[in-house]
Amino acid sequence: MFLGTHTPRLDDKGRLILPAKFRDELAGGVVITKGQERCLYVFPAPEFQRIADQLRAQPMTHKAARAYSRVFFASAHDEVPDKQGRVTIPGHLRDYAALDRDLVVIGAHTRVEIWDRVAWESYLAESEDDFADIEEGVLPGL
């Protein structure tokens, strides 16, 4: 399970050093793709395969599933982290998430998310006030 907030920097070659606590789970390979709210999702390869299997199970006639699959898979980039725990974020994904040098990498249960630092701070400012209200709808009875 991926937890926590980390603040690495993107190097001049578009590489990110993965947080040390995430490296073992991601060492076998990752898939980086577009996420919602203009962040990037980083999945361990087996988790990405699980999601791919779920999408494959949707009927081809399901318009929303087709649209989601197109964006999700067309933007995906698979890679094995190097010995230093680095992965290269392709230019089209850096552009999508408006990534600058200063990043925020968060653990989000079964995936890792990569955010531009300013975008993450803005997202938190908008979302934290509603956090208590959202909990009851997402986790009733907690």
Swiss-Prot record:
Keywords on record = Cytoplasm, DNA-binding, Repeat, Transcription, Transcription regulation
Q: Where in the cell is it found?
A: Cytoplasm, Nucleoid
Residues annotated as domain SpoVT-AbrB: 5-47, 76-119
Q: Which GO terms describe its molecular function?
A: DNA-binding transcription factor activity; transcription cis-regulatory region binding
Family indicated by similarity: Belongs to the MraZ family.
The disulfides recorded in the entry are none
Q: Which domain of life is it from?
A: Bacteria
The record's GO CC annotations read: cytoplasm; nucleoid
* PANTHER family cross-referenced by the UniProt entry: TRANSCRIPTIONAL REGULATOR MRAZ
Question: Which organism was this protein described from?
Answer: Salinispora arenicola (strain CNS-205)
Family annotation (InterPro entries): MraZ, MraZ_C, MraZ_dom, MraZ_N, MraZ_sf, SpoVT-AbrB_dom, SpoVT-AbrB_sf
Q: Protein name, please?
A: Transcriptional regulator MraZ
| Name of one Pfam family that matches | MraZ
Report quaternary structure and partners. Answer: Forms oligomers.
Q: List each coiled-coil range.
A: none
A biological process from GO? negative regulation of DNA-templated transcription initiation
The keyword DNA-binding is annotated on this UniProt entry: yes
